[in-house]
Design a protein with these regions (language model features):
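Gram-negative bacterial Sec-dependent N-terminal signal peptides
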Residues: 1-8
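Low-complexity repeat regions of mature extracellularly deployed or surface/particle-associated proteins
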Residues: 8-328
Length: 328
């Protein structure tokens, strides 16, 4: 199904069946592929489907609900002020969203019935974009969010499940390259419930025009959390964890003209926490509450500027807890 060179067209889809290939192309403005509370259908059910949505222009909308296994789903929007929503239910699905433009809103979701082994990839290029990505309930899912060439962007990630791998990038590509035209004022928020998840947040601003903010809220055990901020702007990092045996690494790197602030609060046993702050003015507040197993803290602050930290901990382990602080 293809429509091209058009304005204000609406497409309603209600598809049921297996092994189906569907492609929808829209070129113009104010076009809609309806569904998910925008009214209309845009529902696809069945296994082994390949579904592709392409929209070029401004003020377009794609809203789709899918159900099935082994699906290949792709959504691309090129333009400004577009909206996209993709809600997936099922196992072993691949979801890909690629947005190029400014002031766009995208929401991707892995279903609410214990959906497992899905791959979700979201790539955004542009300014003033908002991204919501959710694993409502499921295990062993992979989520990768990359936001390039931007300022004033917002990413919200929610995960409920175990053994998920989640990465969010702002200003840094997965291959390690850094955007030279990325100006900061970006935010990432995580809310994670579950065990044995691997979670990584990366932010880079290269021109020093704005700051970066990351906040991680985690409930569960044996999670690995990596939080990295670098560049010329101010950095704020916040991590709150309720659970046992979590591994936390927070790294901030700037220059002599900006500020870095880290706040880590962990309630549970047997955590390993590494905090690294380099250059700029540093402040680190760390609160570790412990009811049994020992925790380990390694804090390093390197700078010619101000360096301050506060440490609050409760350690009931008979062998003690390990704390190392280096300032130079």
């Amino acid at each position: 199904l293809t429509s091209s060179n058009c304005l204000a067209n609406e497409i309603y889809v209600n598809q049921i069946g297996d092994s189906i290939t569907t492609t929808i192309n829209q070129d113009g403005e104010n076009n809609q592929i309806e569904g998910l509370s925008g009214s209309g259908n845009a529902q696809l059910s069945g296994n082994n489907k390949t579904v592709t949505f392409n929209q070029t222009g401004d003020n377009n909308q794609t809203r789709v609900w899918t159900n099935g296994g082994n699906q290949q789903m792709s959504l691309t929007q090129d333009g400004n002020s577009n909206l996209s929503k993709m809600d997936n239910h099922g196992d072993n699905n691949n979801m890909s969203v690629d947005i190029d433009g400014d002031s766009n809103f995208t929401h991707t979701e892995i279903g609410n019935g214990g959906d497992n082994d899905n791959n979700m990839s979201i790539t955004i290029d542009g300014d003033n974009n908002a991204i919501y990505s959710e694993v409502i309930s499921g295990d062993s899912n992979n989520v990768d969010i990359q936001i390039h060439k931007q300022d004033n962007s917002y990413a919200y990630v929610r995960v409920n499940g175990n053994s998920n791998n989640v990465k969010a990038w702002q200003g840094k590509h997965e291959d390690g390259n850094i955007d030279t035209d990325e100006t900061g004022d970006n935010e990432v928020y995580w809310i994670v419930t579950g065990d044995s998840n691997n979670l990584a947040s990366y932010q880079t601003d290269d021109n020093g025009n704005g700051g970066q903010h990351i906040a991680n809220y985690i409930t569960g055990d044996s999670n690995t959390v990596k939080h990295t901020q670098r560049g010329s702007g101010d950095h704020d990092g916040f991590i709150a964890i309720d659970g046992d045996s979590n591994d936390v690494e927070l790294s901030q790197r700037g220059n002599s003209s900006n500020e870095q602030f880290a706040d880590i609060e962990i309630d549970g046993d047997g955590h390993t926490v590494d905090v690294y702050q380099r250059y700029a003015d540093h402040t680190a507040n760390i609160n570790l509450t412990n009811a049994g197993g020992a925790y380990t803290l390694d804090l390093e602050q390197t700078s010619y500027s101000a360096k301050t930290y506060s440490m609050t901990g409760t350690c009931t382990n008979s062998s003690g807890c390990g704390i190392t602080v280096t300032q130079n």
